[in-house]
Amino acid sequence: MQCVYVCDTLEPTFRDLQKVKKVKGKTAIPCGEYDVRYRMSMKFNQNMPYLEDVPNFKGIMIHTGNNPKDTQGCILVGVNPRGSNGIVMPRLVSSRDSFNRINDLIYKAIKSEEGVKVIIMNV
């Protein structure tokens, strides 16, 4: 398996689901390794990359967005800007460019039957 940095991501708040309840659209995806497949998205009216078999979650897409309110429980892709103090800002820029890059890689890998996995870690 080849791991390649393509972009940064933004998703909802981490919640330890062993201790607290999931909050729909506001809870980070549990740590784990998930297959990616394409499915039709009614929201975007096109085939989009979705994470498969995430426990207690449905419809987790990888898509564009810039702010935490844009996630609705999905993974947003882009570049985390840094403030003048060097601290990462809780938002994304260049989301569309990042999505186009990652979507192209996902599409090529699935088409060539390599398969694609997303690994979620809390760092």
What spans do the regions from the language model cover?
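Cell wall/extracellular polymer interaction/catalysis modules
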Residues: M1-V116, M121-V123
